Amino acid sequence: MGRRHGWADEFRTFFPTLWLILAPLILSPLLFFGQEGKCAFVILTMSCYWVAEVVPLAVTSFIPMIALPFLGIVSIKEVAPKYFADTNIVFFNSLMLSLAVEECQLHKRIALKMLTYVGTRPHWLMAGFMIITSFISLWISDTACCALMAPIAYALLEEIMIPKMRPEEKENEIEVMKIFDKEDPEEKEKKKLDTSRLSVRDRGICKCMMLLVAHASLIGGTGTINSTGPNLIFRDNIEKNFPNEDHGISYLSWMAFAIPPMIFYMFSSWFIVQLQFLGPRHLMGMFREPTETEKQEEEVAKRAVWKSYDQLGPMTWAEKSTLVIFVLAVLSWVSSDPKVIPGWSDLFRKGYVTDSCSGLVAVFLLFIWPKKKPDFRIFRKDKSRPSVRQEPLIDWDCVRRRFPWSIILLLGAGFAISDAVRVSGLSSLIACSLNSTISKMPFFVMQIILSIVVVVMTEFSTNSATASIFIPISFKMAEAVGAHPLYFSIPTAIGPSFSFMLPMATPANAIVYETKTIRMIDMVSCGVFLNIFCIAITAINMNTWAFWLFNMGTYPDYALRHATNMTGNSSQCF
């Protein structure tokens, strides 16, 4: 037995090194199948490394810069700019703004204030957390949003559940947000939430709360075009495929398309998760008068929320300043090119000023605007006191310590792969194969099949990687069968955000999984049904509201011009 244990130990120790060598060796035959095969080799090798996590994700993101030039697919001069392309700068701006929000604790104030309005009954508490989380996720990345909201949800669960887990401690007052404070490690261990010592119902509430935070952060990311990697990859692809064309996609038009189904995605998650862990009786209970026990629980939760909110004190200068800069940045994105009326970007030379420019102005302000009210002489009561220079809202030391550069590199790799898939002809080859299989089917059925493939794939790789592969394919498929360019590409951009099933599918899932309140099987069982609901909602939206909004019943002139320009350059299968 000891020997077998030793071999297992050895295997676990050396598996990363072994896989680093074996994965490219196994895939090496692809190198003999032209540019398409070489591109597939790079993508599959990266996917193997991503799934197994044999090296950090950020390091794996360097592979396109190494492999694509060496294999003669794309030159380094073309690959390198993808890592800090215009679209990636927009995402950089969003992350910097979210860092400023986190630094001044504005997100915490917004979350707790909204919770005071939605109530503390379990149904409405969960709904409230979903609404708050998805709202925040509209403006920042799903990973950052979940990282901000999961500790708040967990701390609230600790406040409500620990007294039930340890009846002898009921008389003790437990401060709500201890998770954020420095405290004695032994004391913290004593107060640690252990769901195995709770009733089935209370354990279910814990699972619901944490899963819904992860789901809401992913769902909220679908609502704006700048908030998540797949949406940005879609935006980058449509601008590359149809440069200087009025394709109808803007910050405002995307919100008009995406917000209505986002509400249905959230309701589906709220309904499925509670049905799974608490049962239909619990759901029906929202319409009856609460029992005395439930009233006591609600009172505990209400006190916890208000206590946390009161501890924040009055709104600080830093919070007000960050909120104003954040709102101005969002307004600049919404109004730059609203399509329905001329935007402010029309004041400048066409193509010179984009959303990244206005976002960088906001980021620049964060580094020069003071964290505290300026200490000007005219504001001081004591004129004899010397002036004090105030620190900015964020400084570079804060960025160096806390900025998630790995996400920027991961997204940059996604852009590089997406471009390589298009340039190498791999997108044409795969689209051709799919087209020969499903071309005789109605467009509606083709759209659903493509959505299912994307949603399944995104559970086993990062959402940016999935989007970077399938979005170029979706454009080629639309061109091949004569469908509107957005008809297949938009569901392909939305689908990677439906990675609800596995912890490794997205960092948001990993964050809530690490709280130990949920198991892998819990995620999978809920995720399967939620994926089905979300695919159905997307299909209905694409063939009703979005169909009208983007005028998909008519093949657009810009797509016709593009198809004409590409004649002779396309794959022979078309």
UniProtKB/Swiss-Prot annotation:
What lineage, starting at the top, does this entry show?
Answer: Eukaryota, Metazoa, Ecdysozoa, Nematoda, Chromadorea
Q: Which family does it belong to?
A: Belongs to the SLC13A/DASS transporter (TC 2.A.47) family. NADC subfamily.
State the protein's name. Answer: Uncharacterized transporter B0285.6
Instruction: Write out the transmembrane intervals.
Output: 14-34, 54-74, 124-144, 205-225, 253-273, 323-343, 350-370, 403-423, 441-461, 485-505, 520-540
Q: Give all cystine bridges in this chain.
A: none
Q: Where in the cell is it found?
A: Membrane
UniProt-recorded Gene Ontology molecular function terms: citrate transmembrane transporter activity; succinate transmembrane transporter activity
Glycans attached where? 565, 569
Offer a single GO CC term for the protein: plasma membrane
- Cite a single Pfam family from the UniProt record: Na_sulph_symp
What is the membrane topology noted in the UniProt record heading this document? Answer: Multi-pass membrane protein
**Which InterPro entries does the annotation name?**
Na/sul_symport_CS, SLC13A/DASS
- The region annotated as signal peptide is none
GO biological process terms, alphabetically, are: citrate transport; succinate transport; transmembrane transport
Q: Which UniProt keywords apply?
A: Glycoprotein, Membrane, Transmembrane, Transmembrane helix, Transport
